[in-house]
Amino acid sequence: GKWTRDEIDRQINFIRNHKMAGEGHYRVKYLMENTQGIYDELIENFYAYPALQPPMPWLDNVPPTAPSELKVRTIDSGYTELKWQAATDNDPRNNPMYIIYASNEYPVDTSRPENIVAQNIRETSYIYAPILPWNAKKHFAVTAVDRYGNESTAAQK
């Protein structure tokens, strides 16, 4: 391509600094072929953490209720089981999904994407199995999210 990685970096930083609603990349061929190392650059520096669907307030701006009664217990092999009471949504057609956050700091900061360990969970339980057991997190938060991207406050433990 007739572009530089610095140009892509500047464009992404501009979009983020001005809180614009998303970004697109043309052509995907450059990403797939890692032209000029652009794929590696994006994964390492811009998209290193999971992203949540942005809210769509023009369709619905009311988040679900927060999950409640979060219980956390250690089970076999150092895994951690989380259980909670279901959230409800103002739209009866919508069953909220859940986002699981984990951190060594309490309360868990749900504004930090690096704390997301799972999303789109449909059940009211989750087994946390850290990739590196010695790097397991101690504190957990669970939020509910509706189909419009509205996220509830967190149940914390």
PLM region spans:
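Recognizes extended acidic, P/S/T-rich segments that occur
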Residues: R93-N135, R147-A155
